[in-house]
Amino acid sequence: KTNDGKIKLYPCMITDYPDVAYRGTVEGFYGTPWSFDDRIEQLRFYGKIKMNTYIYGPKDDPYHSSPSWREPYPAAEAKQIEALVAEANRNKVDFVWAIHPGKDIQWNKNDSIAVLNKFEMMYGLGIRSFAVFFDDISGEGTQPEKQAGLLNYIHNEFIKIKKDVNPLIMCPTEYNKSWSNPKPNTYLDILGEKLDPSILVMWTGDRVVGDITLEGLNWVNTRIKRNAFVWWNFPVSDYVRDHLLMGPSYGLDIHAKDAMSGFVSNPMDKPEASKVGIFGAAMYAWNLSEYDSNKEWIAACNIIMPEAPEAFKVFCDHNSDPGINGHRYRRDESVESKPVVEKYLKELSEDNFPQKESEVLACLFKQIAETPATIRAKSTNESLIKEIDPWLIQFEHLGLAGSVSLKMASAW
């Protein structure tokens, strides 16, 4: 306000842009693929959280992988993909269609043309971004020279000719450090030497499931001679199907901005429950240096269940860890209550009754027992409730069992 009471507006420019060019998800899990409606909702969600990439690669779609990758989609399924592409465009999301030919590919002209024909069909459905996956295969399809030859052929005969198509993305067979040959002039080095420089190469980190570190990215970038396109296997749970991974998206190096070309999260087969982890991935890829995983987890819970955010946080906090698994990947769970439980059990083991901890745990178990009813009563997201309902049932039982156990211990 000026001295004469007038309001003066000063011009300014607000500049906001992402650290990572490609940000989104890869539907790349094993198990039942998402439904058409699930994908529509996901694409709308991505638009809201500034994600711009959705890679279609469900392992159990036979027209994406074997046995039918050479064949066109049936008319009804093709129509759905066309509608998904249109929805993606409305939300400023690139729909990337991936093919997975490596299980039974023949390294000949016929199969090279078969890939181009399939891409041409998908191009006709509106797709302008493409990927080729060679992950989780063995035998003939794993040869790096042959893979590079096919990818360069696609680049020269399809990507370059089409003037409106984005750079080709590939997922290698050796897609993490623990599975990679460390010797020079082997698989990754061959890809780095032979692949056209514009082709993007995906990478899951030091392991199949694990954290993303700058050190690990530098290791692979040197070998593939380009910045890796990160495929982060979180919150995917196909290796622990009886668990939900709904905790914070952490374990992501905030100094890796200049070491990655893209960042996509591989979600669970439960799309609504996956939104918690996806939200964190989106915030990380937009601004690495300012990323705070716990802050963004709280924001995600508030956005995903605004009708009952506190109850939802309680549920997510206690459904975060995959438990014992073959990947040896663990997550923090029950963060605030864990030390109380440990102190309680320690005191009991020493024949002392921990009155203070008992009172805290009594409140906690009461809260756990009541949380499912609160979520069911207040949430308007029926799809989410349907996805997590088995865990809501067990969560209530956990709270009731905990309360009974405390009473038994105090009586003893």
Give a label for each model feature.
Residues Q42, Q80, K118, K146, ...:
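General structural feature for long, well-ordered alpha-helical segments within catalytic domains
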Residues K1-T2, V276-N287, L398-L406:
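Short, Φ-rich (hydrophobic/aromatic) sequence segments
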Residues R23-G24, E157, G399:
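Glycine-centered structural positions embedded in regular secondary structure
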Residues Y291-W412:
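C-terminal functional modules
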Residues K1-D111, K118, G124-R128:
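Feature activates predominantly on carbohydrate-active enzymes
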Residues G28-F29, P67, K118, G124-R128, ...:
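Catalytic-core regions of glycoside hydrolase
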Residues P74, N108, P144, D206, ...:
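Hydrophobic alpha-helical scaffolding
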